[in-house]
Curated annotation (Swiss-Prot):
It is an enzyme of class 3 (hydrolase). The gene is ung. This is Uracil-DNA glycosylase. Its main location: cytoplasm. The keyword Acetylation does not apply. It comes from Chlamydia trachomatis serovar L2 (strain ATCC VR-902B / DSM 19102 / 434/Bu). NCBIfam families: PRK05254.1-1, PRK05254.1-2, PRK05254.1-4, PRK05254.1-5, ung. It comes from the Bacteria.
Length: 229
């Protein structure tokens, strides 16, 4: 299997937290599925970017989690960070709405859709499912990624404190509701998804960007600079 699928590619802090997953039966089944898919179909993101979110934001540096669903399935869009696209790519509708809310909330205008600068500041941009077939949304759902990303969220809940979980949409809320059943020391911000179908039902006006920085400041932590240069 391609080296991009091995835990050795992850920061040591994630290796330590997730080491038990690699020996689980579901993981070997997922790897076999991915090997077949990458061999016979166009899959996003590129293999080397599957774990970009974990590489960009080590476990011990996570301050905020923004949970997405599955990667963008258009050409050149997905690069391993939820909601993000590489520099030079047109903004997908959900990201356009995210930036609209950011401007309304904090007066910040971003043109580039690459959210790497957020990830570098401790914002874990995690999709629930980490791969997808070109042009086929949710095509890799139910193959094991959900269990793996459950493990990521569970480790953060259990072994970190004062992480801010940002849940946009029912899928993110449902995922975390199952995992937040024990007492925890975290903050949760939830609202409808930023997609054009749902944004007007409460995403616009949620003020999550200023709320995140308010909570970080209250914790004595550095606030996120949401401006992308």
């Amino acid at each position: 299997m391609h080296e991009a699928f091995t835990i050795e590619q992850l920061p040591p802090s994630w290796q330590e937290q997730l080491k038990d997953e690699w020996s689980q039966p579901y993981w070997s089944q997922l790897l076999a599925f991915l090997k077949s898919e990458y061999a016979q179909a166009k899959i996003y993101p590129k293999k080397e970017n599957i774990f970009a979110a974990l590489r960009s934001t080590p476990f011990d540096q996570v301050r905020v989690v923004i949970l997405g669903q599955d990667p963008y399935h258009g050409e050149g869009q997905a690069h391993g960070l939820s909601f993000s696209v590489p520099r030079g790519q047109a903004l997908p509708p959900s990201l356009r709405n995210i930036f609209q809310e950011l401007h309304t909330d904090l007066g910040i205008r971003n043109e580039s859709g690459c959210l790497q600068a957020w990830a570098d500041q401790g914002v874990l941009l995690l999709n629930t499912v980490l791969t997808v077939r070109a042009g086929e949304a949710f095509s890799h759902a139910g193959r094991g990624w959900e269990r793996f990303t459950d493990a990521i969220v569970t480790k953060l809940i259990q072994n970190r404190t004062h992480v801010i979980f940002v849940l946009w949409g029912n899928a993110a809320r449902q995922k975390c509701n199952l995992l937040f059943q024990t007492k925890h020391q975290h903050a949760v911000l939830a609202c409808p998804h930023p997609s054009p179908l749902a944004a007007h039902r409460g995403f616009f006006g949620c003020c999550h960007f200023s709320k995140i920085n308010y909570l970080l400041k209250k914790q004595g932590k550095t606030m996120i600079n949401w401006k992308i240069e």
